[in-house]
Curated annotation (Swiss-Prot):
Required for accurate and efficient protein synthesis under certain stress conditions. May act as a fidelity factor of the translation reaction, by catalyzing a one-codon backward translocation of tRNAs on improperly translocated ribosomes. Back-translocation proceeds from a post-translocation (POST) complex to a pre-translocation (PRE) complex, thus giving elongation factor G a second chance to translocate the tRNAs correctly. Binds to ribosomes in a GTP-dependent manner. One of its GO terms (molecular function) is translation elongation factor activity. The lineage of its organism: Bacteria, Pseudomonadati, Campylobacterota, Epsilonproteobacteria, Campylobacterales. It catalyses: GTP + H2O = GDP + phosphate + H(+). SUPFAM superfamilies: EF-G C-terminal domain-like (SSF54980), P-loop containing nucleoside triphosphate hydrolases (SSF52540), Translation proteins (SSF50447). This is Elongation factor 4. GTP binds at residues 20-25, 136-139. Its main location: membrane. Keywords: Cell inner membrane, Cell membrane, GTP-binding, Hydrolase, Membrane, Nucleotide-binding, Protein biosynthesis. It is a peripheral membrane protein.
Amino acid sequence: MKTKAPMKNIRNFSIIAHIDHGKSTLADCLISECNAISNREMKSQVMDTMDIEKERGITIKAQSVRLNYTFKGEDYVLNLIDTPGHVDFSYEVSRSLCSCEGALLVVDATQGVEAQTIANVYIALDNNLEILPVINKIDLPNANVLEVKQDIEDTIGIDCFSANEVSAKAKLGIKDLLEKIITTIPAPSGDFNAPLKALIYDSWFDNYLGALALVRIMDGSINTEQEILVMGTGKKHGVLGLYYPNPLKKIPTKSLECGEIGIVSLGLKSVTDIAVGDTLTDAKNPTPKPIEGFMPAKPFVFAGLYPIETDRFEDLREALLKLQLNDCALNFEPESSVALGFGFRVGFLGLLHMEVIKERLEREFSLNLIATAPTVVYEVHLTDNSVKYVQNPSELPPENHIACIKEPFVRATIITPSEFLGNLMQLLNNKRGIQEKMEYLNQSRVMLTYSLPSNEIVMDFYDKLKSCTKGYASFDYEPIENREAHLVKLDVRVAGDVVDALSIIIDKNKAYEKGRALVETMKELIPRQLFEVAIQASVGNKIIARETIKSVGKNVTAKCYGGDITRKRKLLEKQKEGKKRMKAIGKVELPQEAFLAILKID
């Protein structure tokens, strides 16, 4: 494999696309056309390395690959960075785009521009990337290339007159696209003679090499004899190995030079030592300033994860630590619940991220887990003028100590076919949304901009959005600010005891209907006991809804044949006394379905 190329012959580019617009398939085509992987090793979605990515057909972890291509007798190096398309993983997109000079904007010829695509294009434009529009799936019978080109021009303002038309599935137009990448995307800029400055844009854990950093060399060069300074931590490390990225194997190299992309092994035990967005430089001759403008990923949604087998708490800790090695956005701390025992409060980027992590914990580490209802972080202003940040409903102070509660809001952009506009606006109003803008992109598609409370979108908003628009709407959001709201804590009491794992923070106007739905569902799920069980929903000390599970009766008079009625009465009275005593000291075991039911109730 050819390794070095002059900087003018390097092209660093990424692919921006919405889920399902054919991004990973196009990446496979480019890899195949450049012969980076032999036909025998080539398989579909070669850039998606996790089983869960292949099953769901989505990209979660951004991957990179180095391709060699000859054009007009010259050898070029094309560094392709595949990015995730789902809204939860937009932090992966933003850091990948920082290390590129250009991006392919891939749009499905049958669907047009989607909300997430617009968000990622704006990140690319902020980074001054050259954007090449690519219309994919042109071989489908319902493809409408001209309309989609017009759609891109109207929505994003990029000239699409000469946009490449391809079919990744049928391998049409791939050669032209590679040549367009070479002629249109600029070569990297940087000073070869300056001190080393390298941006870490991804990191992961390798069982043999430890924590690895995927870097873009901005200035200078790095070799295997060098000592490296990690500017964020101030620690120095020797270089154990340098590699070029390839989905199937790492290709060793003696050095990485200005403009190149590569993998650096420093023999570290954890990715926290090489945080994404940090700068690597030469320990003896450091660069004066680190690379600017990088924000660490912040969790957006929090949930409790508890092992069903309570003795597997330490196994869960080990599993979370292992996943954290590859996922710098995942953070967790131990917590305990009266109902569920010991577990962890885990921060996620969004609901898909939460689902993926839970599924990976169960699949890769054979854990049986239960997740509590997801929540966001609330800003609670207390009467003594102090401020407390609450992410767990059980931490909310008593009502008489609270001056006001502020909840985080997001700005949501939704693109929908106009026939579903009525249903969608009704859903947004139910979710306490405030309309900011409505814009017709063309005769059949509308773009809505709403501000919404974050806790309204973390439960089931995405599912409801898809069902009220038959799956045609696309959705993207960005956090904006905290706003004051009328929020209360809704508790569920079973046999008089508050079940802390079922508590939720909710809008005051929705508390009654949510409480009523909760107790009705719990009545169906909790098995009948030998004593009567009251299920209550309460806000503060006020009970707002109640259901009663009748006791199971044992026929204590079965062995009395005829005879005196007082004998039967005596036995029934004795039974009644026993039940009263049972009710006072009896504990109700809650089935796991009761906790899962909370997530399903609207």
